């Protein structure tokens, strides 16, 4: 297919995706591979009647990064191709059964995730991009997928030094997406997930260049607090519980406006909703500049909780020395239904999210975690409609509690299978 005719019609093709249906609800399912969400879930327990698109997560990339810990990804003969674990392969083979629940369901393979290595190398040259793209085409064809989703966290930034990156990533990502679209044409969906950080639409991804190449973009409008005592996904700023550092003054609305200012059209934008919370590991430290690539390497100098609270969380299975990601179903089970009632529930009417507090040894009210519930999800759905966005995305199916949040989202967006 010739390049110019394809690129000329792409804006029309991509814009039609959101308008052809009412709204989108893109559900990520952690089948395996994400380093924070834990082991992959059971695909046989999925109820996909509440969504329009399923992003199966994750495929990973064979790479030569020195920090790679997965031995299976180090095969030099497979470098830059997409790796699927045995479980992921088994799950993808079961998709025909899953589709019977929802014949209109679109299923994409999501490649990447937090801490996933290999993107910078795979996107670096025409040759490496060709290897990656051929691998993607083979997987999409083999499993009858509807497209591919790239979750590169993050070009240029490298997850604050966690994975390899380079300044050329921004342009190379554009080239990768351009060539990926050329390879798939209009027959398959090509989508990406992008971060909430203010630098993302400014210097990590070239929004104006990539938008015409994509069917839609999933905004990861969560993880606002970086593990500190603030909301994970506040819709707006809170007056009752203000941030300490200006660098942490993020909100969902702030992120949406940043991408709009960068040139992304609202009808190509899915608002991300996180079905989880994070317990604070440290106090906000105004001295840390999170726009710098090495920010993650800053030492933790001011723990938020005292010994009593640390011991409490440890007794609940949460180690504050590690990642403090807590799924919504565990929040319901462990925090909201705590028989000892050690946590107090709150609703912040500025931020439009619920949160929990715990008392310190001195009786001070401390921020335990924020999360989403049916009320906050419904409010975010209303925001999606008012702003004219394409729909919603959520991470992830296995974190929901009896499909409460997915069902609320579908109801609020008037999505039916």
Regions found by a protein language model. Name each.
Residues 65-86, 155-322:
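Substrate-binding surface in catalytic domains of secreted glycosidases
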Residues 54, 109, 150, 180, ...:
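Conserved, mostly hydrophobic/aromatic
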Residues 21-140, 305-306, 312, 318-323, ...:
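Glycan-recognition patch characteristic of GH18 chitinases/ENGases
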Residues 333-417:
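Extracellular low-complexity, Gly/Ser/Thr-rich intrinsically disordered linkers
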């Amino acid at each position: 297919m010739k390049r110019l005719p394809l690129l000329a019609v792409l804006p029309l093709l991509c814009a039609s995706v959101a308008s052809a249906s009412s709204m989108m609800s893109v559900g990520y399912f952690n089948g395996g591979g994400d380093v924070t969400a834990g082991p992959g879930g059971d695909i046989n327990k999925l109820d996909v009647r509440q969504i329009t698109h399923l992003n199966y997560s994750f495929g990973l990339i064979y790479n030569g990064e020195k920090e790679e810990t997965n031995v299976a990804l180090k095969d030099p003969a497979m470098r830059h191709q997409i790796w699927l674990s045995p479980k992921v392969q088994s799950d993808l083979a079961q998709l025909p059964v899953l589709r019977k629940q929802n014949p209109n369901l679109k299923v994409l393979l999501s490649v990447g995730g937090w801490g996933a290595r290999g993107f910078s190398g795979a996107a670096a040259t025409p040759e490496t991009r060709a290897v990656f793209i051929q691998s993607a085409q083979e997987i999409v064809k083999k499993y009858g997928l509807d497209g591919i989703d790239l979750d590169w966290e993050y070009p240029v930034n490298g997850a604050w030094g966690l994975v390899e990156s380079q300044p050329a990533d921004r342009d190379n990502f554009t080239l990768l997406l351009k060539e990926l679209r050329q390879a798939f044409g209009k027959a398959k969906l090509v989508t990406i997930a992008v971060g909430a950080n203010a630098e993302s639409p400014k210097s990590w991804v070239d929004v104006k260049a990539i938008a015409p190449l994509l069917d839609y973009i999933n905004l990861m409008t969560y993880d606002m607090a970086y593990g500190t005592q603030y909301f994970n996904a506040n819709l707006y700023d809170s007056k009752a519980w203000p941030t300490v550092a200006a660098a942490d003054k993020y909100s969902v609305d702030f992120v949406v406006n940043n991408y709009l200012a960068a040139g992304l059209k609202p009808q190509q934008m899915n608002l991300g909703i996180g079905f989880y919370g994070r317990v604070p590991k440290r106090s906000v430290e105004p001295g840390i500049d999170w726009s710098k690539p090495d920010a993650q390497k800053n030492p933790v100098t001011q723990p938020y909780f005292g010994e009593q609270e640390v011991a409490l969380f440890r007794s609940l299975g949460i180690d504050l020395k590690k990642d403090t990601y807590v799924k919504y179903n565990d929040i319901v089970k462990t925090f909201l239904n705590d028989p000892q009632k050690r946590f107090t529930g709150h609703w912040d009417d500025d931020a439009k999210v619920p949160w929990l507090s715990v008392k310190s040894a001195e009786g001070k009210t401390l921020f335990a975690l924020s999360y989403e519930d049916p009320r906050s999800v419904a409010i975010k759905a209303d925001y999606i409609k008012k702003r004219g966005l394409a729909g919603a995305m959520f991470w992830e199916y296995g974190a929901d509690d009896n499909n409460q949040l997915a069902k609320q989202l579908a109801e609020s967006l008037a999505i039916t299978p």
